């Protein structure tokens, strides 16, 4: 009897081994089916709410092209803005990976959310961990509303028109060094070909180093200088940093668990060391340079002990982000401007004629800040460059109203309330190239910004510096920086296309700020005004 049972047990064991692969395959198929159905239900979110939406792919939502490196943030949101599902809609539902979000399209609705109802959309969706990342979480871009409000109140006077005018001397000094750098590059020749973004990045790095740190970075004289190396370091796509950025932008609720950092450890050490040194040195010397360090020292003397400025890394956080945001956005804008001027010689000739007249009527051929800001056609050119190539090609906010936000009037009358915590996005690039607001939007035409045509612009369709209370605090400084760079280049050079110039501009898919892909090469011909 025992032998019989042993034979039966052996047979069952053999049968189990035979059936095991079948069971495993069946189990895997069941799991895959459940996950797939869950994905389908997840991405039916907008359908269930009766909201128009762009169909999403399982697991990746509507950002597959961005994730696979086929396009940048700006191009991805423009693609969604121009999708057939979004046409004629005030807003459309999208999915950024697993995050349900809205893409706003109607300028009146954009104004409501960015300006009129700012209190209900006062923070951005992306965030970093304030406990681990004391430097990244305190700057004006990433900070949540309470921190942003205090920081903005402190630094808004630094970027006011009068303060920016006082900084003009620092900008003009570096502009002269830009001219010297280009003359050295020319080496007695009649013309030269240069990669423009690199040239402009050296110029803007030296400007931000002077304004934010009160030091001379000497990037134009030595492109391998430490300060310039740190500007490259902050954009270095190392795996660990990419993971942190990915979490901050797509899964901000996990920032605390991951311990995200906006900057690399090396960049943070450099910022702390530089800030401590400069503050100590300036306090001893008593020098007044009309820069950010002057503001820091004044705050240390006047702000009470409970002020936000006494938090760890507060000053370093502001200077670090000014460097990150200031050098890249302005250098890209100058690059795009030179690219368009090289392709549109009639516009370049008119701009250089305006500059020549201003130089001839000025004392010692030196232009004052008021003269530069008063150059009408230069302003039109810069404004049109910022329309065609907005540095920040998309904007975002997060609904922070606990009771949600009623969007029924914008949903064709159908009831719909946006849930708390839901992000909303605005495709600045999409709006700026929408033929509904800008006829022939792909054409570079500074006349769009003539005094007559400005009056015809639709409100909230020109957003290169954002809008509302959380719009770019450094708008005036950024515009002046761009103008000074262009003037010092066009003062001595005519810009032309060369064999390596791309016929159509393509954007770097790895860059957050709108940046030319694989460089922008132009010919600079010696032709002083």
UniProtKB/Swiss-Prot annotation:
EC number: 1.14.-.-
Any GO molecular function: monooxygenase activity
One GO term describing the cellular component: endoplasmic reticulum membrane
Broad class of enzyme this protein falls into: oxidoreductase
Residue sites binding heme per the record: 472
Gene3D superfamilies given in the database record: Cytochrome P450
Keyword Metal-binding belongs to the record: yes
Any single GO BP term: response to DDT
Domain of life of the organism encoding this protein: Eukaryota
Cellular location(s): Endoplasmic reticulum membrane; Microsome membrane
Protein name: Probable cytochrome P450 6t1
């Amino acid at each position: 009897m025992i032998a019989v049972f042993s034979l039966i047990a052996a047979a069952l064991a053999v049968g189990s081994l035979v059936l095991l692969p079948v069971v495993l395959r069946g189990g895997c198929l069941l799991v895959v089916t459940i996950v797939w159905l869950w994905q389908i239900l997840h991405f039916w979110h907008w359908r269930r709410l009766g909201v128009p939406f762009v169909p999403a792919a399982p697991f990746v939502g509507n950002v597959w092209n961005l994730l696979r490196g086929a396009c940048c943030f700006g191009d991805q949101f423009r693609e969604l803005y121009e999708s057939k599902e979004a046409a004629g809609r005030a807003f459309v539902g999208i999915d950024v990976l697993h995050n349900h979000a809205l893409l706003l399209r109607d300028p009146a609705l954009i104004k409501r959310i960015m300006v009129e109802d700012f209190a209900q959309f006062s923070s951005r969706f992306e965030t970093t961990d304030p406990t681990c990342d004391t430097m990244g979480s305190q700057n004006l871009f990433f900070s949540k509303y309470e921190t942003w409000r205090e920081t903005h109140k402190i630094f808004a006077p630094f970027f006011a028109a009068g303060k920016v005018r006082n900084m003009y001397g620092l900008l003009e000094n570096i502009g002269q060094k830009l001219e010297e750098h280009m003359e050295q590059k020319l080496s007695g020749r009649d013309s030269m070909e240069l990669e423009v973004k690199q040239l402009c990045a050296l110029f803007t790095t030296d400007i931000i180093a002077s304004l934010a740190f009160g030091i001379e970075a000497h990037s134009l004289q030595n492109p391998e200088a430490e300060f310039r190396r740190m500007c490259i370091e902050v954009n270095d796509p190392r795996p660990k940093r990419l993971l942190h950025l990915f979490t901050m932008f797509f899964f901000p609720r996990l920032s605390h668990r991951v311990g995200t950092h906006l900057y690399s450890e090396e960049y943070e050490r450099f910022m702390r060391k530089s800030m401590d040194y400069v503050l100590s040195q300036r306090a001893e010397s008593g020098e007044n340079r009309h820069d950010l360090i002057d503001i820091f020292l004044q705050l240390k003397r006047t702000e009470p002990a409970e002020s936000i400025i006494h938090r760890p890394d507060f000053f370093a956080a502001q200077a670090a982000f000014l460097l990150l945001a200031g050098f890249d956005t302005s250098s890209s804008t100058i690059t795009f401007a030179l690219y368009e001027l090289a392709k549109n010689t009639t516009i370049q000739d008119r701009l250089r004629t305006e500059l020549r007249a201003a130089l001839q009527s000025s004392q010692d051929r030196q232009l004052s800040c008021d003269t530069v800001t008063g150059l009408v056609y230069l302003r039109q050119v810069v404004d049109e460059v910022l329309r065609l190539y907005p540095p920040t090609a998309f904007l975002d906010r997060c609904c922070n109203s606990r009771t949600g936000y009623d969007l029924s009037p914008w949903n064709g009358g159908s009831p719909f309330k946006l849930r708390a915590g839901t992000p909303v996005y605005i495709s600045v690039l999409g709006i700026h190239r929408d033929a509904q607001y800008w006829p022939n939007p792909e054409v570079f035409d500074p006349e769009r910004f003539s005094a007559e045509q400005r009056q015809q612009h639709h409100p909230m369709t020109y957003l290169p510096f954002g809008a509302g209370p959380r719009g770019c605090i450094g708008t005036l400084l950024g515009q002046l920086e761009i103008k000074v760079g262009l003037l010092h280049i066009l003062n001595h050079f005519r810009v032309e296309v060369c064999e390596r110039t791309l016929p159509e501009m393509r954007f770097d898919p790895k860059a957050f700020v709108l940046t030319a892909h694989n460089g922008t090469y132009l010919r600079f011909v010696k032709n002083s005004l």
